[in-house]
């Protein structure tokens, strides 16, 4: 679709609370006519344009882990240095250690999943359902890691001195774009049952 095509409109979206470092645009198509030379070659239906989603989803699976690690590292350092109750670091409390242990365990599991899917991809054996598992799992654990990190920091978890809320806001969008977790569950469900629930 070329700019200036009759019936095509695009506009910038302002006032975002998430993904603020990127430009987001709204798109509207009304009776647009696309010349034949602009059609994708050898493509039938949506499979061609949607094929790029696998690469994007794969990258998101890794990128979400970066946000999770930043939140975990922030929470760990904070917990080891923030002193409370008898001048002891809050890292000495059982519930704080439980949160930290959960975070690093889930992050490492996510890394192993991403590594496995990457190796399948390198060998040409990756399946779209593998990519859906990767995106769905890693974004969900990254978002939960951000929430647990925010809990550990208490009131400081919501201030811009720390990265947690920035990552949490962005992860809320990442949870939705390139396919919501519900869509990925349906993709995986179709793969394991052989029955499409998309009808």
Write out the residue ranges for each language-model feature.
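Glycine-rich phosphate/cofactor-binding loops in nucleotide/flavin-utilizing enzymes
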Residues: 153-199
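FAD-binding core of flavoproteins
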Residues: 1-73, 182-184, 191-199
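Conserved catalytic-core motifs characterized by acidic clusters
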Residues: 13-16, 38-53, 77-93, 151, ...
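Alpha-helical scaffold segments that form or flank carboxylate-/histidine-based iron centers
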Residues: 91-102, 128-137, 165, 170
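C-terminal helix-coil-helix/basic helical segment that borders enzyme active sites and/or dimer interfaces
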Residues: 79-80, 84, 88, 104-137, ...
């Amino acid at each position: 679709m070329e700019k200036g095509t009759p019936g095509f409109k695009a506009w910038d979206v302002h006032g975002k609370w998430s993904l603020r470092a990127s430009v987001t645009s709204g798109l509207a198509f009304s009776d647009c006519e696309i010349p034949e030379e602009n059609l994708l070659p050898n493509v039938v239906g949506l499979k061609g344009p949607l094929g790029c989603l696998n690469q994007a989803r794969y990258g998101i699976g890794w990128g979400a882990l970066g946000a999770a690690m930043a939140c975990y590292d922030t929470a760990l350092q904070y917990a080891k240095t923030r002193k409370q109750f008898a001048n002891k670091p809050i890292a000495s409390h059982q519930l704080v250690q439980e949160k930290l242990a959960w975070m690093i365990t889930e992050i490492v599991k996510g890394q192993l999943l991403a590594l496995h899917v990457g190796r399948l991809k390198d060998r040409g054996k990756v399946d779209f359902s593998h990519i859906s598992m990767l995106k769905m799992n890693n974004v969900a654990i990254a978002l939960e890691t951000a929430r647990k990190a925010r809990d550990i920091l208490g009131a400081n978890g919501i201030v811009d001195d720390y990265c947690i809320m920035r990552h949490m806001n962005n992860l809320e969008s990442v949870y939705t774009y390139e396919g919501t977790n519900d869509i990925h569950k349906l993709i995986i469900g179709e793969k394991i049952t052989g029955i499409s629930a998309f009808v």
